[in-house]
Amino acid sequence: MGGPSANMYRMKGKDERICAKCKKPSCISPVVCKNLNADHTPLLDIYKAVDRLPGIKKSFIGSGVRYDLLLHRYADESLNKAAQTYTEELIARHVSGRLKVAPEHTQDEVLKQMRKPSFSQFGQFKKIFDKVNRQYGLNQQLIPYFISSHPGCTEADMAELAVTPRACISSWSKYKTSRLR
């Protein structure tokens, strides 16, 4: 299971009238819209239903998770709890060994053009990923996807993209840089 925006199942505006008047191109960039119903509970219910099907031992999410939605602090505490529960459930029970996510770049100016969160959020998610792995005695990997030569990306941005992930990942965990090659 998974795909683009894998954890956005049933997410839409709480009040469709507000959405109809909205001129923004994204409900999640540069910040998560207060009108977005970002409840991860319906998706957790699907995971549990799939896992209960006869012949299914375990279901996996391979990629497509928007970690910015999981890290966002919502005004509604029940949404924060659902995001936290989803994050732990995802990492502990629905990763087959590698979870692929798409920070897509390391430079904030390029990421703004892509409507993606700051690369620092990838680091925050990596720390949570590693913590849950330790807590459950797992040895899973978080694999970042990057895009090169995006319009608006300079040669200096590309040079930073070439070195930043290795430097950050080695400082975030005991993950060996040589494993990135």
What is the role of each PLM region?
Residues 1-143, 147-151:
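Conserved SAM/AdoMet-binding glycine-rich loop
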Residues 156, 160, 172-173, 178-181:
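C-terminal accessory regions of radical SAM enzymes
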Residues 94, 168-170:
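Structured loop/turn residues at beta-strand edges in well-structured enzyme cores
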Residues 50, 90, 165, 175-176:
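Generic low-polarity alpha-helical segments
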Residues 78, 150-167:
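Catalytic cores of alpha/beta
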